[in-house]
């Protein structure tokens, strides 16, 4: 369904959807690591992995909210459409990440599990909407700007460059 990120391909040959979907996978890896460590009650390790996950997700949100979404809204004229829905979901996920992080800090496995389950479902649904609806719309509307936007996104998402 989605293609894999190839850092040897020139950046201009990678579309927005593929680039941002690969960043979703990059973030997801840290969430999966958190889950494994929390299940083993390795609270320090889980908290560290979750902190990295949260940092990467917040960088991803920032790249979307400060660069990608405004460019899409300007070009498409849609300001209260899919980008507003995504911003609202970002707000909800920030709250869930705060709650999950607090549960890890308290070493409360039950509370963490509840927060993490809700967060996981929300992240999966959110990513599907972005990857199957919003990012293809961005590729369509921002095609002529992709050669400028993709390097800027890469700069904002440093984990993607490696």
Model-flagged regions — what are they?
Residues 2-162:
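Small-residue-biased structural context
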């Amino acid at each position: 369904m989605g293609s894999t990120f190839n850092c040897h391909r020139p950046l201009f040959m990678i579309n927005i959807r593929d680039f941002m979907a690969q960043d979703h996978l990059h973030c997801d890896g840290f969430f999966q690591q958190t889950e494994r460590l929390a299940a083993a009650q390795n609270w320090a390790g889980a908290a560290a992995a979750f902190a990295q996950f949260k940092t990467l997700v917040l960088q991803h949100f920032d790249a979307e909210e400060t660069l990608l979404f405004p460019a899409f809204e300007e070009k498409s004229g849609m300001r209260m459409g899919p980008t507003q829905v995504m911003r609202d979901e970002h707000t909800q996920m920030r709250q869930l990440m705060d709650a999950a992080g607090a549960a890890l800090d308290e070493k409360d496995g039950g509370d963490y599990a509840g927060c993490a389950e809700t967060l996981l479902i929300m992240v999966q649904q959110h990513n599907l909407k972005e990857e199957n609806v919003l990012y293809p719309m961005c590729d369509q509307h921002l095609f002529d700007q992709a050669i400028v936007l993709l390097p800027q996104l890469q700069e904002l998402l440093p984990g993607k460059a490696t």
